Amino acid sequence: MSKQASMIWVTCGCCVCWCGTDRGAATNGEALPKSSCSATGRTTSRVRDVLSGPRLRQVALVARVCDRVAGQLRGSFGWPEPFSDPGVAQFGLTNAVFAAGDTFVEVVSPVQPETTAGRYLDRRGGDGGYMAIFQVPDLAAARRRVADLGVRVVWSADLPDIAGTHLHPKDTPGAIVSLDWADPPETWHWAGPSWTGQVPGHAPGGLTGLTIEVTDPAAAARRWAAILGARARDEPPAAVVELPEAGQVLRFVPAAAGHGEGITAVTIAGLPAAVPVEIGGVSFAGEER
């Protein structure tokens, strides 16, 4: 959900800063450079070849109190200070974005009434997993696929170095799905200036999977697979979507009685906690990769 709809990051000679503008509009600043990744030394063209399928790049939790859940994540996993995106205020939210390897875990909280996040909290009955953001190599193709499926788009933006497409939650059982693109692919504008146009030093590992509670696991898995251009497999009473190139698995299971649909578990390679730890209504567990 970390989307700066009224702000854009631009280069100012020796640093990266932000200035006010509508997302997708031209800026008075200099366009972000399409350079090689400073952390790896690989060129943009070579890096782009690595990602030929979708990858889960970010997962968002929704919480009543952002600071409390963010503090629990830092305390449990030793993650560095999160990025707080001022742009999400226009969605009636506050947030914190943590780097987990070269992927990201976000916490959002509503600060205004009548927000999508607030309604989700009410349906779910408390804090929980809220959104899955997938990085795709060809956003135009992904958008065509979504249109062909009749899936509605509730928000989209196109910036020089990143673009995103939020899908209607009623068309994606279990969570909001976003299809995003980044250039260079290792960067991630939504994580703030340290990840904009460059890749900072970071711990190894990253997101390896989600568990999503839904009313109909088989139907939900087929829907997500169609959106992502992947394949679904039934494992009654659950169903699975695998993203083999990314080494990630999405597992759909029957929703618990009395709970709404939502993301209930996240696995992360390199996470210190081998035993699951529940934070913000989501079970976090480490996984070897």
Walk through the language-model features, giving the residues of each.
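Short, flexible helix-coil linker/hinge segments at the edges of structured domains or between repeats
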Residues: 111-123, 183-185
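An N-terminus-focused feature that recognizes amino-terminal "leader" regions
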Residues: 49-112
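Amphipathic alpha-helical segments
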Residues: 65-80, 141-149, 216-231
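Vicinal oxygen chelate
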Residues: 15, 47-48, 55-64, 96-101, 106, 118-209, ...
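Short loop/beta submotifs within extracellular cysteine-rich repeat domains
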Residues: 81, 115, 231-232, 259
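Low-acidity, Ser/Thr- and Arg-rich intrinsically disordered low-complexity segments
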Residues: 2-23, 27, 33-46
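N-terminal beta-strand motif that seeds the catalytic metal site of vicinal oxygen chelate
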Residues: 47-70, 127-134, 183-222, 227, ...
